[in-house]
Amino acid sequence: MKYKRIVFKVGTSSITRSDGSLSRGKIQTITRQLAALHRAGHELVLVSSGAVAAGFGALGFKKRPVKIADKQASAAVGQGLLMEEYTANLSSDGIVSAQILLSRADFADKRRYQNAGGALSVLLQRRAIPIINENDTVSVEELKIGDNDTLSAQVAAMIQADLLVLLTDIDDLYTGNPNSNPDAVRLDKIEHINHEIIKMAGGSGSANGTGGMLTKIKAATIAAESGVPVYICSSLKPDSLAEAAEHQADGSFFVPRAKGLRTQKQWLAFYSESRGSVYVDEGAEHALSEQGKAC
């Protein structure tokens, strides 16, 4: 098989209804395909959003909350509901699922990064399907990874995946917004992610999620630089996961760097925290604090 170890990422809108509640039908479509790929011998990881969206209704919120504490409480409820659906569906096919909640600190700290990678390796060797989400209940805003597109790319690089698939309700990458620009052309293959590609990606995603095409391009950069090819394709098609695994998906494919960064360089490039101090003399201090400019 071309791609044995695959990381799939599904966004909030791909597994919820328009009112933000979980769609069992959409989740069943995803788990059905995962089960088929698992039987075919693939090693699979699923990075799934949706905890906040699944939980806020159960707590009585009429719409997705904006306050941090409200979102964290919603995630605490919703993560359990989310895993309940995935576990029930996969166990009916005899597949063990494992919940892993990660935060930026798990990548920034080298020992925790190595421990997480080790646990994932064992789960894959034992034929389990890890289901990963950011630990929204305890992550503070300034220390969050921020979106699961980035998280999935970091996980794909960590475990040296053969493919990262970003599933979305946004139909691939175009040269412009196809909803407003009839001349927009879909990009089937991207050899190199440059400023023009980033500019094409535009802005935000759906009302229930945190990502958009721009976050997917940034995620594709992390994965491709680490030697992992990336597909961005629609989650609305019934066999989208299987098609991506066979390199037959109708989406945008990002070619990886020929020689991907090794684990140590990945950690230094993308995850380690930069720290330092800048010392200035009295003249520079005066210019910065009193005159508001650098000298």
UniProtKB/Swiss-Prot annotation:
ATP binds at residues 9, 168-169, 210-216. SUPFAM superfamilies: Carbamate kinase-like (SSF53633). Its EC number is 2.7.2.11. Its main location: cytoplasm. InterPro entries: AceGlu_kinase-like_sf (IPR036393), Asp/Glu/Uridylate_kinase (IPR001048), G5K_ProB (IPR041739), Glu/AcGlu_kinase (IPR001057), Glu_5kinase (IPR011529), Glu_5kinase/COase_Synthase (IPR005715), Glutamate_5-kinase_CS (IPR019797). Keywords: Amino-acid biosynthesis, ATP-binding, Cytoplasm, Kinase, Nucleotide-binding, Proline biosynthesis, Transferase. It is found in: Cytoplasm. GO terms for molecular function: ATP binding; glutamate 5-kinase activity. GO terms for biological process: L-proline biosynthetic process. The keyword Aminoacyl-tRNA synthetase does not apply. Pathway: Amino-acid biosynthesis; L-proline biosynthesis; L-glutamate 5-semialdehyde from L-glutamate: step 1/2. It catalyses: L-glutamate + ATP = L-glutamyl 5-phosphate + ADP. One of its GO terms (cellular component) is cytosol. Gene3D superfamilies: Acetylglutamate kinase-like. Substrate binds at residues 49, 136, 148. The keyword Amino-acid biosynthesis applies. Belongs to the glutamate 5-kinase family. Catalyzes the transfer of a phosphate group to glutamate to form L-glutamate 5-phosphate. This is Glutamate 5-kinase. It comes from Neisseria gonorrhoeae (strain NCCP11945). The gene is proB.
